[in-house]
UniProtKB/Swiss-Prot annotation:
Gene Ontology cellular component annotations, sorted alphabetically: cytosol
Function: Required for rescue of stalled ribosomes mediated by trans-translation. Binds to transfer-messenger RNA (tmRNA), required for stable association of tmRNA with ribosomes. tmRNA and SmpB together mimic tRNA shape, replacing the anticodon stem-loop with SmpB. tmRNA is encoded by the ssrA gene; the 2 termini fold to resemble tRNA(Ala) and it encodes a 'tag peptide', a short internal open reading frame. During trans-translation Ala-aminoacylated tmRNA acts like a tRNA, entering the A-site of stalled ribosomes, displacing the stalled mRNA.
Keyword Cytoplasm attached: yes
Identification of the protein by name: SsrA-binding protein
Gene Ontology biological process terms in this record: trans-translation
InterPro entries attached to this UniProt entry: SmpB, SsrA-bd_prot, SsrA-bd_prot_CS
SUPFAM superfamilies associated with the record: Small protein B (SmpB)
Gene designation per UniProt: smpB
A Pfam family the protein falls into: SmpB
UniProtKB keywords: Cytoplasm, RNA-binding
Amino acid sequence: MRIIATNKKAYTDYIIDETYEAGIVLVGTEVKSLREHGASFKDSFCRVKEGEIWLLNLHIPPYQHGNIYNHDPERPRKLLLHKKEIDRIWSKLKLEGYTVIPTKIYFNNQGKVKVEIAIAKGKKSYDKREEIKKKETQKRIKEYLKYNR
């Protein structure tokens, strides 16, 4: 498994509830561009539309050696999941405050591009501050134990 890009903001801004591995429908120049340049998750999210899941605002840069048939960098991309998984995601999305975000995009062992998506709930600012405080105290305890043995 070769990771192309990860969504680092997902773990700081959201509480991750469930994760799913999904295939993604791409054109040839997008795959070539992913191999060369990677992707950007800035403001990307998923939406369920007519029984299908679509990934929106995932930026895949244009392929440098492409011609006039190069892809649109911000186009909506269809995700491939089983119907039961889509229904489970849709039932969670009906609840207040839940959203579906991409967390990782990677090549699996067969060379196929996969996207890890997560059902997440947004964190409040005080939740983020509490998490930062916990990390700092854990770091201080670790340093204290390291130097005072």
